[in-house]
């Protein structure tokens, strides 16, 4: 989960980046900022209702990101109104603005032992970090939050490798963590 206190993940910062990329209009940005709190409450209630034993240990503002809001609202793109703003495009645009590489993860290119043997499932899920590959002596790690330096340092300590984060969508990282670690535990 991206650190929502990080200004780079604020609704204003994200709108500014999407505006600069011509993916949303000024009117859309204003409308999104007005709807943000209400939509976060809706998504928070949905999240809680999906849990068997809901534990209310956070506020909607801290558990639901602005990107979640954008995806829920299914925004039309300003540059191509026939298309919707999707998660891949949002994260790719943010990665470009942050000057961090973006990578669409191909699960067929991942090695089970590297993914599941580098960090624990609980750590991977908590920080949304997915080890992808070792390139030029560096561990490439996919994450929707390339600025979680503390978690990245922890992975460096455990793996004894320099870690290079790449941006990937939150849903891809979550899905592949569940699939790879689930498969790993099913065969052991």
Task: Walk through the language-model features, giving the residues of each.
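Short, low-order "capping/linker" segments at domain edges
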Residues: 174-188
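Non-catalytic accessory regions
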Residues: 1-152, 158-162, 167, 171
């Amino acid at each position: 989960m991206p650190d929502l206190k990080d200004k780079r993940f604020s609704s204003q910062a994200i709108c500014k980046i999407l505006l600069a990329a011509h993916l949303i209009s000024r009117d859309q940005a204003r409308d999104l900022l007005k709807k943000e709190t209400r939509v976060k409450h809706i998504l928070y209630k949905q999240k809680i209702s999906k849990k068997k034993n809901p534990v209310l240990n956070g506020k909607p503002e801290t558990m639901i990101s602005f990107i979640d809001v954008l995806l829920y609202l299914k925004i039309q793109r300003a540059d191509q109104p026939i298309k919707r703003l999707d998660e891949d495009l949002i994260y790719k645009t943010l990665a470009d603005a942050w000057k961090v590489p973006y990578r669409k993860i191909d699960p067929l290119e991942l090695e089970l032992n590297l993914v599941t043997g580098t960090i624990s499932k609980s750590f991977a899920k908590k920080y949304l970090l997915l080890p992808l590959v070792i390139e030029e002596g560096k561990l490439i790690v996919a994450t929707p939050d390339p600025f979680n330096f503390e978690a990245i340092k922890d992975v460096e300590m455990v793996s004894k490798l320099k870690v290079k984060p790449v941006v990937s969508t939150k849903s891809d990282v979550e899905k592949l963590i569940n699939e790879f670690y689930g498969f790993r535990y099913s065969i052991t």
